[in-house]
Amino acid sequence: MKEMKRRFRLAAVAIVGPIILAGTLGSAQTNPPKEAPPDVPDAIAVPAGLEPVLFAHGSGAQIYTCQAGADGKFAWTLKGPEAELKDRKDKVIGEHSADPTSKLPAWKLKDGSEITGKAAAHVDALDPESVPWLLVNVVSNAGKGQLANVTTIQRVHTHGGQPPDYGCDESHKDAETKSNYSADYYFFAPAK
């Protein structure tokens, strides 16, 4: 009788063990580890109580137009970004552009969620040829996807994107130029 109970326990472990392991692996795939926040200067640190909920690598261009400033001098003025957003597995998840109505920076994901934001703070990039790192406050959310509860964005690890230092004068008024850039975007929402 003892031998039969021992065999039954061994059989149960042999059957149940792989099921438990499969369940554990399955939940690991559906609940990915939380994103770690980037190491940034205090000037663009996110407020307490927020946690990163999404990472995206953006690559594309910063678009500039040649405009006269208040002083009458012409300079390249940022029109907006035009970039593709990819996740850590290099899968395209959305796009980054300027909202056509507000002209504010906008992020739109393939899941239907989208946000617009306004820069709240910046620090110069390590490379003077690169656009600054930013802290962006979200001013509007739409859709029910990953961006639905996002309140803050950090743009970090920028490469390129500054306008050229030539080619903008009165004879080139309203001319447009694109400057290639890439950056990492971290999206933050209230901690759960």
Name what the model sees in each region.
Residues 2-3, 26, 58:
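N-terminal targeting leaders of exported, membrane, and organelle-targeted proteins
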Residues 13-23:
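Bacterial N-terminal signal peptides
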Residues 31-62, 70-192:
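Primary mode marks residue(s) on the alpha4-beta5-alpha5 output face of response regulator receiver
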Residues 22-32:
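Bacterial Sec-dependent signal peptides at the C-terminal "C-region" and cleavage site
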Residues 2-14:
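Bacterial N-terminal signal peptides that target proteins for export
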